[in-house]
Amino acid sequence: MQQELTLLDRINYPAELRNIPLEKLPQICKEVRNYIIDTLSGIGGHFASNLGVVELTVALHYVFDTPKDRLVWDVGHQTYPHKILTGRKDKLNTVRKFNGLSGFPKREESPYDLYNTGHAGTSISQALGEAAARDLVKENYNVVAIIGDASIATGMALEAMNHAGHLKKDMIVILNDNYMSISKNVGSISNYLNNIITSHFYNHWKRVFYTFLKWLPIIGPATERFFKKVEKGFKDVLTPGGLFEDLGFGYIGPEDGHDVIRLVKMLEKVKKMKGPILLHIITQKGKGYDPAERDPIKYHGVTPFRKEDGAMDSGDTSKIAYSKIVGKMLAILTETNPKIAAITPAMIEGSGLKEYAEKYPEHLFDVGIAEQHSVAFAGAMTNGNIIPYMCIYSTFLTRAMDQLVQDVSLMNLPVRFVIDRAGCVGPDGETHQGLFDLGYLLGLPNMDVFVPSNGQDLIDALRWMEKYDKSPVAIRFPKSSVDLKTLDFYKETELQPGTFRVFKRGTDVALISIGSMIDEAKKASERLENEGLSVTLIDLVWLRPLGAEALNEELVNVRCFVILDESYIDSGVTGYLLNRMTRENLSKYIKTFGFPPEPIHHGERKEVFQKYRLDGESIAEQVAAVLKKNLIKP
């Protein structure tokens, strides 16, 4: 007997959703939520945030004529319900997989995705740009930005709101508040007030009243100002929207973000209002799945889990992530040095600092999504004789370029930059790849750069940085794990700046490996030796200071050399190294293995490496082919 179709089975695009009666929307929300739970329990992905926006997403596509009306999602990891309703339901099981759906909005995937996102705080700027463009060409469509309560506190979001309040363009910002941080008045009074504020009757007669006051001689303008202050004061007492009104936004809320029918009715009213409007809704991360409701941080991003109780595989306990090494080592150092501080821009969990924060809360500074502030803040701490470890993802450090230059490197302030997720990050994709950092770090005055090729290197560098105060220093490492048994957290090893390792010496070709490329370099060297070639393998962990003289000496007796760099070829280490080669050695350079200057899409690191021929086997094949072409034979 054929299974009866669900409501969701009949919906592939928003136009079909809009044909569903309003009273059926709660059932659709239930089915969308169950679809996400069923799918992600098998494959993993961003979880709690997506469960929290199901009703909002259904309401948005029900009320607005998408894609003509523009939805701009901030960050974007909460767009799985959006993807389900915009023609990608049957592909959700490929999300974050190689050649599958992106975990974020992506223009190439769908006309419903306006921008490729991944970083926080951009949506209001983009929505305002859309609204300004619309009005310039005299078109007619709605523009809606959806932003979370953490993202709206970013400097960029506040700058955009300030500009939007000045321009007075018709646009809607939906504040998705799931932490209750600015939401104390959810209930009948705020609901009653919102019904008044959004009514056509109220807004029409308010405009008439204020227009009348402007025409009154002498007392008119003063009376208008008085009544506006009374109106604002009344709303400030009953709602938390004073800040947004001060920025020039009409404020509605807080509203229950899980009452889809009320959301639809409220959005229908809000879209008829003039000027910039902020609709504040309250949601719960993990809504509808008990384990995620109880621990939304744990279930923010999940691996495959048992649907019945949310149990996830603990993974390989013999390995430890580079991020966890950082947190563990900083805790060890802080035990004996009260001047150490760890700084992170809203990435305590991701940067491996959870246990550190619990053990040394007064030494941990989570500055929020404020990368620019975090770098200047760290620089100033050094002026107070504090030893700051600035823990940040490579992709987010690019947001603080001006502060890196002016507030740290030009003044030679000894900030310790601990740069996580450098190189290829895998499933997070193009907006999170850490492929730019070496290019700009090596261009900064005074900045020392260390690229560990293993976990012990990272431990040794973190310990060495504690006492190093001559300049700022950056260490960068991949999103990867290492064998725990290979590590000694208490070993006292003195790093020697400007040194490198030589694993083997040969005469045909030298492989110069930069940091995390060492594993592929070792595989390539073994393959080349199996083909009868004599290989030099150099593990170049110090980029600045660079042991240029010693490196040139190593290359004297080889016929040619290649560089292996997990960065963009045009903005990595190649130019930096070649500028320091002798003329004789410079002529021996044949190739850099790195990423071409194009967006590097998501997939497991191994798959991405194979696509771009950066795995050991592919490197060996290409090197052997070049040597054969140039008559360098075994």
Swiss-Prot record:
Glycoprotein is among the record's keywords: no
Gene Ontology CC, one term: cytosol
GO molecular function terms noted in the UniProt entry: 1-deoxy-D-xylulose-5-phosphate synthase activity; magnesium ion binding; thiamine pyrophosphate binding
Cofactor: binding details: Binds 1 Mg(2+) ion per subunit. Binds 1 thiamine pyrophosphate per subunit.
Binding of Mg(2+), residues: D149, N178
Pathway info: Metabolic intermediate biosynthesis; 1-deoxy-D-xylulose 5-phosphate biosynthesis; 1-deoxy-D-xylulose 5-phosphate from D-glyceraldehyde 3-phosphate and pyruvate: step 1/1
Keyword Transferase: yes
Reaction it catalyzes: D-glyceraldehyde 3-phosphate + pyruvate + H(+) = 1-deoxy-D-xylulose 5-phosphate + CO2
Cofactor(s) required for function per UniProt: Mg(2+); thiamine diphosphate
EC number: 2.2.1.7
InterPro entries: Dxylulose-5-P_synthase, THDP-binding, Transketo_C/PFOR_II, Transketolase-like_Pyr-bd, Transketolase_C, Transketolase_CS
UniProt keywords, alphabetically: Isoprene biosynthesis, Magnesium, Metal-binding, Thiamine biosynthesis, Thiamine pyrophosphate, Transferase
GO biological process: 1-deoxy-D-xylulose 5-phosphate biosynthetic process; isopentenyl diphosphate biosynthetic process, methylerythritol 4-phosphate pathway; terpenoid biosynthetic process; thiamine biosynthetic process
Binding-site list for thiamine diphosphate: H77, G118, H119, A120, A150, S151, N178, Y289, E371
EC top class named in words: transferase
Pfam families recorded: DXP_synthase_N, Transket_pyr, Transketolase_C
Family: Belongs to the transketolase family. DXPS subfamily.
Xref: NCBIfam families: dxs (TIGR00204), PRK05444.2-2 (NF003933)
Subunit and partners: Homodimer.
Biological role: Catalyzes the acyloin condensation reaction between C atoms 2 and 3 of pyruvate and glyceraldehyde 3-phosphate to yield 1-deoxy-D-xylulose-5-phosphate (DXP).
Protein name: 1-deoxy-D-xylulose-5-phosphate synthase
